[in-house]
Amino acid sequence: MGYKYRDLHDFIKDLEKEGELVRIKEPLSPILEITEVTDRVCKMPGGGKALLFENPKGYRIPVLTNLYGSEKRIKKALGYENLEDIGWKLYRILKPEVPKTFLEKIKKLPELKKLNDAIPKVVKRGKVQEEVIMGDINLEDLPILKCWPKDGGRYITFGQVITKDPESGIRNVGLYRLQVLDKDKLAVHWQIHKDGNHHYWKAKRLGKKLEVAIAIGGEPPLPYVASAPLPPEVDEYLFAGIIMERPVELVKGLTVDLEYPANAEIAIEGYVDPEEPLVDEGPFGDHTGFYTPVDKYPQMHVTAIVMRKDPIYLTTIVGRPPQEDKYLGWATERIFLPLIKFNLPEVVDYHLPAEGCFHNFCFVSIKKRYPGHAFKVAYALLGLGLMSLEKHIVVFDDWINVQDIGEVLWAWGNNVDPQRDVLILKGPIDVLDHATNEVGFGGKMIIDATTKWKEEGYTREWPEVIEMSPEVKKRIDEIWDRLGIE
């Protein structure tokens, strides 16, 4: 059975049947009130339920939050019980095996057909363009949230921001926040490390305007893939097609030479003129749990807004963890593990805890084979895409479960001599990190929490870990039910 959801409407119907969605009929304001309700739900055990606010004050369009905010729902949205299976599919695209014999070529055909079937498909019309607004554009007609009291304004937080490389024409779909500046203007938060920022600076160098489209919704994997740290050569909508095993259908923009999902709820078209001065963007209550200050970013001019007849405004709340992004980050962690293992076969597992905002801590377990192996792995991780922004990398032995914070702290505290096992370096840091003296550049820490060898400067005999004998464990297993312990 193939992927069954055509759009968000299909998905939330299924969630409602399974008791995973709550319809809220009470009128609530998009200014702070919807955030407060969502924040409380996100902090419930397991992430809480998806929330559909049917009557946002002053708007006809309902607001959907916390859609991906549990392990169950993110798995359901992507259509996989084991998310690492998606990673292995991505691995086969990036590192294809070249068939050596005719028989191997024949065996490769079904896989090549699946890849071909996943290529995005442009269609003549889609539901997203059922209603068209050009000329008298007003972004304030959309129930865009102001999330936190000191935010600089209302922000679109779950838009798939679509641009094309001005030189190569390669599409990028990224998840960048957008601040409403005026009824037809947005500030685009293109951080320096992101592909959208590269497109902007290329357009500026070439003296061209950069066309932009923002899609809200679509098939459930689409908002996720916009957040995924894919290599620049991998099209996000192709990746979504690989996940669904069918193509993402796209429609051509009405005022821009870009395509966006035909089954999206809402799309916003426009352009950025790199010759214009940058504008103030922020403050914004971010996923770090702190406000990011005002900074300068490009301004987007909106030329059209299109939407379905019955649109839903999908948005996400970010703030002090845990929030919905805990589960989006967890999905990325699981999906990209196979690619990390390909580059570093000694890696057993890794974990980017949401409490560390994904870029503050990386816990990794390895099969240690030689002195200094932990540092070698840490250096390599810092060379992998956005892993370069990690601030603390802690390396453990293969038998430590890095998903278990109790085991992590036990091994870290017992195995580390700060004078010997800690290395301080400098490098790129996430621009949202407020602890560094310079924006985007600061210190990093590598910690070797593995068992130490004499060649690494350890001069004593390393103690054995306490373990019960297997015979006793087996004996107690056999009689456990008779002990009356519940």
UniProtKB/Swiss-Prot annotation:
GO terms for biological process: ubiquinone biosynthetic process. GO terms for molecular function: 3-octaprenyl-4-hydroxybenzoate carboxy-lyase activity. InterPro entries: HBDC, UbiD, UbiD-like_C, UbiD-like_N, UbiD_Rift_dom. It comes from the Bacteria. One of its GO terms (cellular component) is cytoplasm. Signal peptide: none annotated. Transmembrane segments: none annotated. Pfam families: UbiD, UbiD_C, UbiD_N. Belongs to the UbiD family. NCBIfam families: mena_SCO4490, UbiD family decarboxylase. This is Uncharacterized protein aq_1612. It comes from Aquifex aeolicus (strain VF5).
